[in-house]
Amino acid sequence: VLSTLHTNDAVSSIVRLEDMGVETYLVANSLVGLVAQRLLRKVCPNCAKEVETTEQERLFLGEDVKTVRKGIGCSHCSNTGYKGRIAVHEILAMDNTIRRMIVNHDSVEAITAYAREHQHMRTLKESGLMLVKQGVTTPEELMKISYE
């Protein structure tokens, strides 16, 4: 298990390992999976209110997201609107196709596209968007960790 590779997503860890001098064949044959994770602050359940999304939020989240939950601040959350944290993950499971893609030096985008289509991998943004739609966290928190 390796941690803290300072990458924006799980797939970019492949390039990061190669940049650190790990031979491509070792990266391809040694990895079992890759996980990127971030912590998002959770909306305080005591002061959460349903609010309309702004134009900027709809551009980021999608036009279908008309309302979100946001904390207005209370004594339970020290007037921050947030209480607690939750992890969002991006998980890439290695398979023979991905191993070949690594050896062939396919792009991060190509590997990500393959994983999303064939493994149903969710990006950090997609995982976080689910939490925003469920009212667990806010668009602001998701924007902080999303590099898409």
Name what the model sees in each region.
Residues 1-148:
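Short, flexible helix-loop junctions that flank or precede catalytic/ligand sites
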